[in-house]
């Protein structure tokens, strides 16, 4: 009798994706982040569902409903902080996942890579709308500032902003629709993640060497299931340490002040995971230019496959490209720091230099260095 795991239409899909999947024998811990992102997504959907049971998306009661969750709901505080800090863990895993893709040339699977970029945009939109929901000062002013950026679009900008707001300012209608979108988007993300996996399994996984591994495959289970469980354990331990010891470490104290349209906070800034893009936005004095730079800071990933000039796929054996990659990482950390600083000297200049360097590395230096490496190897 054949195994039901391999014959039943439903279990066959699971079997071919997570059990009998042929995987390269040499993929490192950097390949753990896909499964960790899946765990983050499930965790966010579950905690979010329980929060939505007690949350009210009305400007008069939103702030107090979050307070009510933390004070009166059974284990409400842990659900709320797991959701808030879970978003931070989600973005840490996302950035490391994208970084891995850049380092090892995973972008040479264009379909998987492009779906990944769409996923990144969708997750960023979801996180932004979620940040608005507690209706604190930073929620309100963050929503006002970021949605206002769309007014930079020529001709239709102002109408577009008012259409998104549902009025002439961020108000009740805005909060209600942001809650609706914040609820539905994670399910769209789940569908996109399934498509992401579908495209990945068409080609098979890349590996650190960047060399095809068809001649040397091992089954996903037990080798990589146990490896993923170890990664998941690290993720949960880190998250729970954050939640139980310093839940407000990554948040903004201003968000504990109820939203007040008549009082602007001294420094409006988004959550830490958007600071690099926010710094790029602020480094351009022109509004439309800043918005374009903001979008391009993520969209630039889409043309990375076209700029791949090296004859090797991975950076594993390319020390010059490795130096550039780590310079890019340092540059992104610098941008993150600048995004949280006030708009004054010397932070403005540092931000502008870091922004220029970011695009220069990705669009100019990487392709040039790759050609230089080809010549050094006499290829």
UniProtKB/Swiss-Prot annotation:
Known role = Component of the ubiquinol-cytochrome c reductase complex (complex III or cytochrome b-c1 complex) that is part of the mitochondrial respiratory chain. The b-c1 complex mediates electron transfer from ubiquinol to cytochrome c. Contributes to the generation of a proton gradient across the mitochondrial membrane that is then used for ATP synthesis.
Q: How is the cofactor bound?
A: Binds 2 heme b groups non-covalently.
The organism's lineage is: Eukaryota, Metazoa, Chordata, Craniata, Vertebrata
Membrane topology value:
Multi-pass membrane protein
Source gene?
MT-CYB
Q: Which GO terms describe its molecular function?
A: metal ion binding; ubiquinol-cytochrome-c reductase activity
* Chain residues that bind heme b b566: 97, 196
Q: Which SUPFAM superfamilies would you find in this protein's record?
A: a domain/subunit of cytochrome bc1 complex (Ubiquinol-cytochrome c reductase), Transmembrane di-heme cytochromes
**A Gene Ontology cellular-component term:** respiratory chain complex III
Primary location class? mitochondrion
Q: Which organism is it from?
A: Ictonyx striatus
Q: One Pfam family from the UniProt entry?
A: Cytochrom_B_C
Q: Which family does it belong to?
A: Belongs to the cytochrome b family.
Q: What else is known?
A: Heme 1 (or BL or b562) is low-potential and absorbs at about 562 nm, and heme 2 (or BH or b566) is high-potential and absorbs at about 566 nm.
Does this entry carry the keyword Heme?
Answer: yes
Q: What is this protein called?
A: Cytochrome b
